[in-house]
Design a protein with these regions (language model features):
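A short catalytic or substrate-binding loop motif that flags glycine-/basic-rich loops and adjacent residues
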Residues: 107-109, 329-331, 375, 385-388
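Residue-level signal for inorganic ion chemistry
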Residues: 59, 106, 271, 291, ...
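Conserved S-adenosyl-L-methionine
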Residues: 138-260, 283
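Conserved Class I SAM-dependent methyltransferase catalytic core
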Residues: 220-222, 226-239, 250, 260-261, ...
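Internal alpha/beta scaffold segment
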Residues: 145, 414-415
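Short amphipathic alpha-helix with an adjacent loop that forms part of the alpha/beta core around
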Residues: 46-51, 258-265
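Non-catalytic nucleic-acid substrate-recognition regions in nucleic-acid-modifying enzymes
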Residues: 1-102, 340-396, 405, 410-411
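S-adenosyl-L-methionine
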Residues: 1-20, 61, 65-73, 108-163, ...
């Protein structure tokens, strides 16, 4: 997203954006046909109007071309141009440091370079409260995006409660509480890079900070977060306390089968495990079936959101999703399944006896063949070969890939 912004607007974004990843100020664009032209383009810019020669800086360079094939080398060219500019105009040179006050970002595309200043100096998902994290943490801005897609700000105003029954380090519940409290995520940090920017106005920034603090409210919402692992709950409690919402969230350690009815209406949002390998996915089917059962028994009239990478696992829940949204959890493409839990959205029978037999057979074959393949150093082998006549296909595993091939049907099928 690009646009024009005043200093007031920049400070508002730094304080209030829950979804953004970086906040960059574009300084200039110019030609970069080769390293000499890149140097000239960057050396002639008035860098002393951006930061002082007393500040340390570093350069991030992204992109290559036929002439500039190495990002590290191109970044060094930009760095040299900046240093030489300061030396010529001020008689001093700024230092270069990996933990620099100022971060210059260069993007090269089609022999054109765009130079920007990273106004914060860190990814905006790093709110600073999550120093404790579980095995598969979800980024704060992704958690916030899921909540926005589930209309959580609107639901919170209408008195809906919130629950995450697989909370891990508590990120989703914490972001939900911060949203409902109208707490600006930027208030949690005071180390923004723009403090070293020449156009920074400390008094104006403090004015916006105080205005943001004044907007914090005590929401009329109950927050529930649980997990099967005790250490995860302790981590989540510590994270929530650092975020300033620990007093709002009821944390508990409990397995899924001990989940009880919480309230009449609310939003349930979870990020359950989703295996990236065939065997792992099949092992997770019972968990997703149990989730569907729990939704029906304990979350009737709630809105539910489930983030998963596998449509097969989503189908195992047994409830119809009225909307899906595409996301990336890190490098994994996922879908957010939005489900209204109500009497009309019945729990469907997701498989027959035969399909359960098929799943059991594939799991059994995998358990046996996986150990054998590891001992033999083999990555390619057949997992299933029409073992059950009703499912006449073969499944072959090639490293991380799976190929399914259907057998030709017989010319005549006996009546």
């Amino acid at each position: 997203v690009t646009g024009d912004a005043s200093l007031d607007c920049i400070y508002q974004i730094a304080l209030w954006s829950r979804l953004a990843n970086r906040l960059h100020l574009v300084l200039f664009s110019g030609q970069a046909y080769n390293n000499q032209i890149l140097y000239q383009t960057c050396q002639q810019f008035p860098w002393q109007t951006v930061f002082s020669d007393q500040s340390a800086f570093k350069v991030h360079f992204h992109g290559t071309s036929n002439a500039l094939r190495n990002e590290m080398y191109a970044g060094q060219v930009v760095k040299d141009a900046i240093v030489d500019h300061f030396r010529h105009h001020t008689g001093h040179r700024p230092s270069v440091d990996k933990d620099a006050d100022i971060q210059v970002v260069a993007y090269l595309k089609y022999d054109q370079v765009t130079i920007s200043l990273d106004l914060l100096g860190y990814s905006m998902h790093q709110r600073s409260y999550r120093t404790e994290q579980g095995m598969a943490p979800i980024k704060e801005n992704l958690a916030a995006a899921l909540l926005w897609r589930m209309n959580w700000p609107k639901l919170a105003k209408e008195g809906y409660d919130f629950a995450d029954i697989m909370c891990g380090s508590g990120t989703i519940a914490i972001e939900a509480a911060m949203m409902a409290s109208r707490m600006a995520p930027g208030l949690l940090r005071q180390d923004q890079a723009f403090h070293h920017w020449t156009h920074h106005q400390p008094s104006l920034w403090e004015k916006h900070r105080q205005a943001a603090k004044a907007q914090v409210v005590n929401p009329n919402v109950r927050f529930f977060a649980s997990d099967t692992k005790g250490f995860a709950i302790e981590q989540a409690k510590a994270n929530a306390a650092r975020a300033g919402v620990g007093h709002l969230i009821e944390f508990s350690q409990r397995p899924l089968h001990q989940i009880q009815n919480l309230s009449e209406k609310g939003l349930l949002l979870i990020n359950p495990p989703y295996g990236e390998r065939l065997g792992e996915q099949l092992d997770l089917i019972p968990l997703y079936k149990e989730m569907g059962k729990i939704f029906n028994e304990h979350f009737m009239h709630w809105e539910a959101g489930v983030l998963t990478s596998d449509p097969m696992l989503a189908k195992a829940i047994g409830l119809r999703a009225h909307k899906t949204y595409a996301f990336f959890n890190g490098s994994i493409p996922c879908q957010l399944y939005c489900i209204s839990v109500n009497p009309d959205n019945h729990l469907r029978q997701t498989d027959s006896g035969h399909t359960q037999m098929l799943a059991n057979r594939i799991q059994k074959n995998l358990a046996h063949l996986k150990k054998w393949a590891e001992r033999q150093g083999i990555e390619c082998y057949r997992v299933y070969d029409a073992d059950i006549p009703e499912y006449a296909f073969a499944i072959d595993k090639y490293g991380e890939y799976v190929v399914l091939q259907e057998y030709m049907p017989p010319k005549k099928v006996p009546e």
